[in-house]
């Protein structure tokens, strides 16, 4: 199972790929330029690990709190991928997780 976690709600654009029990991540500056090329950042990131968008099993996107523009952009990209490739997506919010030690990106699929 290949899960992709996207968080553009904060100071960095954070991408995490959970591929067959292995965890890979990358972060980028959260700027207008990177908002405009979020799809390219995602494509390049998963391509690094020999995956295509269609091979992603589930998508997870941070729905806040944080930058409205970042949330709007990342949610739009995730919805587009979901519709085009028929991949389920889930929104998460770290504030909903409660217990501090669970607030890790790698726990998002378990907690959602």
Describe each region flagged by the PLM.
Residues 92-110:
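Conserved phosphate-binding catalytic cores of ATP/NTP-utilizing and phosphoryl-transfer enzymes
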Residues 1-58:
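N-terminal beta-alpha supersecondary unit
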Residues 9, 64, 95:
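Anionic group-transfer/hydrolysis microenvironments
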């Amino acid at each position: 199972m290949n899960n992709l976690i996207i968080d553009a709600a904060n100071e960095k654009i954070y991408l995490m790929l959970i591929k067959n029990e292995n965890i890979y991540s990358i972060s980028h500056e959260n700027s207008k330029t990177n908002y405009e090329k979020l799809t390219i950042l995602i494509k390049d990131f998963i391509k690094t690990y020999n995956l295509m968008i269609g091979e992603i099993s589930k998508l997870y996107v941070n729905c806040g709190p944080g930058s409205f523009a970042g949330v709007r952009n990342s949610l739009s990209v995730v919805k587009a991928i979901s519709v085009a490739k028929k991949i389920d997506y889930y929104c998460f919010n770290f504030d909903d997780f409660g217990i501090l030690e669970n607030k890790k990106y790698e726990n998002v699929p378990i907690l959602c």
